[in-house]
Amino acid sequence: MASKKEIKDQIISVTNTKKITKAMEMVAVSKMRKTEERMRLGRPYSEIIKKVIHHVLQGSLEYKHSYLEKRNDKRIGIIIVSTDRGLCGSLNTNLFKQVLFKIQNFAKINIPCDLILFGLKSLSVFKLYGSSIISSVTNLGETPDLSKLIGSIKIILEKYQNNQIDRLFIAYNKFHNKLSQYPKISQLLPLYNEKNIFSNKKIKWDYLYEPESKLILDTLFDRYIESQIYQSLLENIASEQAARMVAMKTATDNSGNRIKELQLIYNKVRQANITQELTEIVAGASAVSVD
């Protein structure tokens, strides 16, 4: 059994750890409120521009944009949004598992994937797997600057327009509530989905565009892609802070339980030492009295 000093040192060590995790929990709570508010403020714009795109694509567009072309899959692009830091539970792990599963499924039918990585954790993981990484952005912080992302976004969009990739996905963590975040992989391009909601053309119609449809639709579709990527970043950042808050609370609670266990062991050792000392005193006294 460990000595009293060793147990006491463990108690001090765990107590210090508890103070750190408690402080990190409080910081995460504060940051989560801000990031959650920022994320919720961004959702209406993201949803409305999605509805605008949906409505535009219901028409019979004279201008056939490359984002609407359905192609045979020869190469896939995936944007992966992760965190820059750890200590957020299994948030990144769950996302990476889904992405790797998707990459492996494409690999089985000889379709390679190009990756755009946002976040240091995704960069460190997918480098190990020898993935085809065409661009990466790290150190985004709690308030990502869209101007830092534009370069990487343009690279992947140019690849799509030049037929170098045939489909584009984005993988991120969707914020549900403070206790629930889940990995999500959505298709960005081409602008259709498996339910084909973007091509339901019962009545042929189109908008009247000024100055011309190409200029407006090019801008609109690019803004749509940018908004979806930026909103995914906000969702992931809010998820990160919520996951870190939960992880640090769990660590704090576990530290508290461990301190109680160690305190109990310490008391037992102390009691055993006292009992042993009393036994030795009584034995010594008995020996003296016999003499």
Swiss-Prot record:
Residue ranges that the Swiss-Prot or TrEMBL entry lists as coiled coil: none
Membrane topology recorded in Swiss-Prot or TrEMBL: Peripheral membrane protein
Compartments where found: Cell membrane
Alphabetical UniProt keywords: ATP synthesis, Cell membrane, CF(1), Hydrogen ion transport, Ion transport, Membrane, Transport
Record GO terms (molecular function): ATP binding; proton-transporting ATP synthase activity, rotational mechanism
Record InterPro entries: ATP_synth_F1_ATPase_gsu, ATP_synth_F1_gsu, ATP_synth_F1_gsu_CS
Primary localization class, coarse: membrane
Alphabetical list of Pfam families matching this protein: ATP-synt
Cell membrane in keyword set: yes
Biological process according to GO: proton motive force-driven plasma membrane ATP synthesis
GO cellular component: plasma membrane; proton-transporting ATP synthase complex
Assembly information from the UniProt record: F-type ATPases have 2 components, CF(1) - the catalytic core - and CF(0) - the membrane proton channel. CF(1) has five subunits: alpha(3), beta(3), gamma(1), delta(1), epsilon(1). CF(0) has three main subunits: a, b and c.
Family: Belongs to the ATPase gamma chain family.
General function of this protein: Produces ATP from ADP in the presence of a proton gradient across the membrane. The gamma chain is believed to be important in regulating ATPase activity and the flow of protons through the CF(0) complex.
Protein name as it appears in the record: ATP synthase gamma chain
Native organism: Buchnera aphidicola subsp. Schizaphis graminum (strain Sg)
Upper lineage: Bacteria, Pseudomonadati, Pseudomonadota, Gammaproteobacteria, Enterobacterales
